[in-house]
Amino acid sequence: EMTRDLRKIARKYPGKTGLSSLGRTYDNREIWCLRVGNPSAAKKLVIDAAIHAREWKNTQVIMRQTEEILREYGEHRARFRSTCLYILPMDNPDGVTISQYGASGIRNAKLRKKIQKIGHFNTWKNNARGVNINNNFPAGFSADKKKDKKKGKKRKPDATTYTGKKAASEKETKALISFIKRISPKTVLNLHSTGSILYWDFDVSSPLHEKQYRLASEIKKRNHYRMMPKSSSTEEHGGFADWLVYEKKI
């Protein structure tokens, strides 16, 4: 349904949008990217959703917002000459399928069998290999592995917490990394569900810290979300945001 809607949008607004795939998942689903605006613009903004499978409601939100933006495109034509939006409505399409339909939604027999053994579909966050994509990025990943080893923890594929054998082991992670490196965006907004909070302070030095504070403050003015303290933003590593901040300085 999302793929159909994206193609419909791209056909309806051919001069304003561009639809492309960042790659395919383990169950052969596309990771779609919809460009809105001038691809040569100096300012590039990425908005992504559903990196955690059970948070697929954000996909519906981002799709609706995209349609609203395009309907009002004419009023902001000058802005879109200098700014380009890249909409990633579903980072984890395999996981979303599992969250919505259980193991039966997965077409690959080997993957489906492993997923059936894991269960917990109503709380499923991970991809089709039972890996949490949002803890699979190369930013503090090895440090967390060392902590687990010290505590004697042996993790394996599951519905919510498994981070993978190594950093960037997953197709979805690699696709996101490759995409960010290719377009070098100024800002990335990573949408999640529940909490009504903003994770923004990753204990980095200025001017990046000041930029993050300004952006979070502007968002707070509009949605009244609570800005979380530094300690809450640095408890876990290997996240998409961790990698964006520490490795790409975004």
Question: Residues of each region from the PLM?
Answer:
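Short glycine- and acidic-rich boundary segments immediately preceding or forming the N-terminal edge
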Residues: 1-27
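Surface-exposed patches in mature extracellular/periplasmic domains of secreted proteins
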Residues: 18-23, 74-83, 227-232
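Proline/glycine-enriched tight loop/beta-turn segments at coil->beta junctions
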Residues: 29, 38-44
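Short, well-ordered beta-strand micro-motif
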Residues: 33-35
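Short beta-strand element of the alpha/beta-hydrolase
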Residues: 42-52
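Active-site/substrate-binding loop(s) of hydrolase catalytic cores
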Residues: 42-43, 56-202, 208
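Active-site neighborhood of phospho(di)ester-bond hydrolases with catalytic His/Asp-centered motifs
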Residues: 48-49, 88-90, 188-191, 224-231
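Catalytic cores of processing enzymes, dominated by hydrolases/peptidases
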Residues: 165-166, 197-250
